[in-house]
Amino acid sequence: MFKEFKEFAMKGNVVDLAIGVIIGGAFGKIVTSVVNDIVMPPIGLLMGKMDFSNLFIDLSGKGYESLKAAKDAGAPVISYGAFINTVLDFVIVAFVIFLVIKQINRLKKEPVPAPPDTKECAFCCSAIPIKATRCPHCTSEQK
């Protein structure tokens, strides 16, 4: 059983998948930082010095000053600002993955089609081997 697991784990696809997951996790952290630290502050500034990560709806109706204060008090809140950041995070990751896949597909060479191995008999229209000098169906001589 251990031998089977070792063979499975050492297959190229499993190792490639593991590397992809690790790199993807690290890339996700970079994108989250880009969204939270670079993209959202200018957008917040344009919208009147708004910090999206602190946007929330207080479901208790007590009117907390900040999201942190509401969470510290245990009040039920909808943190829609964090949701906006997460959506932007996803859109950026999806767009970058799209660009990477598009470039990879552009660099792939189209496979050269194999030359035909059959031809059509000019007399009986049967498919015959390309090297045939006589048709096996009608026995006509081929050029």
From Swiss-Prot:
InterPro entries membership: Mechanosensitive_channel_CS, MS_channel, MSC/AndL, MscL_channel
Cross-referenced SUPFAM superfamilies: Gated mechanosensitive channel
Quaternary structure and interacting proteins, as annotated: Homopentamer.
GO MF entry, a single one: mechanosensitive monoatomic ion channel activity
Matching PANTHER family: LARGE-CONDUCTANCE MECHANOSENSITIVE CHANNEL, MECHANOSENSITIVE CHANNEL MSCL
GO cellular component: membrane; plasma membrane
A Pfam family reported for this protein in Swiss-Prot or TrEMBL: MscL
Residue intervals passing through the bilayer: 14-34, 81-101
GO biological process terms, semicolon-separated: monoatomic ion transport
Membrane topology: Multi-pass membrane protein
UniProt keyword annotations, A-Z: Cell inner membrane, Cell membrane, Ion channel, Ion transport, Membrane, Transmembrane, Transmembrane helix, Transport
Name assigned to this protein: Large-conductance mechanosensitive channel
Homology family: Belongs to the MscL family.
Subcellular location: Cell inner membrane
Function: Channel that opens in response to stretch forces in the membrane lipid bilayer. May participate in the regulation of osmotic pressure changes within the cell.
